[in-house]
A protein has these predicted regions:
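Short alpha-helical
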Residues: 20, 45-46, 80-81, 104, ...
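Hydrophobic Val/Ile/Leu positions in short beta-strands of Rossmann-like dinucleotide-binding domains
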Residues: 14-15, 75, 144
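Nucleotide donor/acceptor-binding cores
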Residues: 9-11, 95, 140
Length: 276
C-alpha cells in the first residue's frame, strides 16, 4: 500500500472524461471549497462550457494531461469506458484513482494499482439530467469503497462536504446495489411510461398522460419519505379488492402484453411488503 499525501481540501483533484456526472461533480467540489486542478473532456463545445463555469480549473482534452497535475483523479466516464481510460494513463505512486460507477468492482482500476496508485469507488446514488446538476448531489448517498483507510476516510468526509453521506460497500455487493438503484430510477421511469400509454383509449397521448400522472408520483414519493413501507403502498392488492384486480388485469392485457406482464409481476412481487 503506497503512502498518500495528506488529503484535504487543498489536495489537487482532476476529473477525467467529464460528462453530466463529472461536470456536476467538478462544480460541486469547487463550490464545496475543494481544489479542482484539472478536468478533461473530448468535446470542444463542452470544454468551452466547462471553462466558463470553472475559471480556476485547467480544462483539457487529454486525460493524461489532467491526471498529471492531480493527486486525486476521478474517472467519471460511462462504465464501459472506465477500464480502458484507466489503462491508457501512466499513473504514479502517491496518486489516488477513483471510479464513480455503481456496478463495477475496484479491479477495473488494477492498471493504476499495479503502477503504485491507490484506488477507490465513489458512486453517487443519483441521476444527473444535465452537466449543470451540481445541486443534485445534496442529500445524496455515496457508495464508497477503498482498501486504503486514509483514502476511504477522505471520501467519507467529501460526501459530507458535498451535502450528502457515505456508506461502505464491497465490490461483491455492487451488482445488487446497482440493480436496486436502476429499479428505483430507470425502471420506475419505464413503468411510468407504460402507465401513461394506457391513457390512449381515453384520447390522451403519452406526454399528456405523463403530466397528469406526475402529481400522483410525487405524492407517492412523499408518502414513502414520510410514512415509509408498507404504509406508502396503496391500491386494490392492499384492500383485497378482487373485482378491481380482475378488471385491471383485463385492461392491461387489452393494452399490451408488456403492460399486463409488468402489472402482474410487480403486484405479485411486492405483495409480501404490502402484507407486512
Amino acid at each position: 500500500m503506497s503512502p498518500l499525501p495528506d488529503l484535504n481540501k487543498q489536495t489537487p483533484i482532476a476529473v477525467v472524461a467529464a460528462g453530466r456526472l463529472g461536470s456536476s461533480m467538478a462544480i460541486a467540489l469547487t463550490e464545496a471549497g475543494y481544489k479542482v486542478a484539472a478536468i478533461s473532456s473530448r468535446q470542444m463545445s463542452h470544454r468551452e462550457w466547462l471553462a466558463s463555469r470553472l475559471k480556476e480549473t485547467l480544462v483539457v482534452e487529454n486525460a493524461q494531461t489532467a491526471a498529471n497535475v492531480a493527486s486525486v483523479v476521478f474517472i467519471t466516464s460511462p462504465d464501459a469506458m472506465i477500464e480502458d481510460i484507466c489503462s491508457e494513463i501512466d499513473w504514479r505512486s502517491h496518486q489516488a484513482v477513483i471510479h464513480c460507477a455503481g456496478v463495477l468492482p475496484l479491479s477495473v482500476l488494477d492498471r493504476a494499482r499495479v503502477m503504485g496508485a491507490e484506488t477507490a469507488g465513489f458512486h453517487p446514488l443519483q441521476t444527473f439530467p444535465s452537466s449543470d446538476s451540481s445541486t443534485q448531489l445534496k442529500n445524496v448517498s455515496f457508495a464508497t469503497e477503498s482498501l486504503n483507510p486514509a483514502l476511504f476516510y477522505w471520501l467519507w468526509i467529501l460526501a459530507t462536504d458535498l451535502g450528502g453521506s457515505a456508506f461502505k460497500i464491497e465490490s461483491s455487493q455492487r451488482a445488487a446495489y446497482h440493480a436496486s438503484a436502476v429499479m428505483a430510477c430507470g425502471l420506475l421511469a419505464g413503468l411510468t411510461g407504460l402507465a401513461a400509454e394506457m391513457w390512449k383509449p381515453l384520447g390522451i397521448d403519452r406526454d399528456d398522460a405523463l403530466k397528469k400522472l406526475i402529481p400522483l408520483l410525487r405524492a407517492t414519493i412523499d408518502a414513502l419519505d414520510e410514512k415509509g413501507l408498507p404504509s406508502a403502498i396503496t391500491g386494490p392488492y392492499v384492500r383485497g379488492d378482487v373485482e378491481t384486480i380482475e378488471a385491471h388485469l383485463e385492461a392491461t392485457s387489452d393494452n399490451s402484453e408488456e403492460t399486463f406482464e409488468a402489472y402482474r409481476a410487480l403486484a405479485g412481487a411486492s405483495l409480501h411488503i404490502a402484507k407486512e
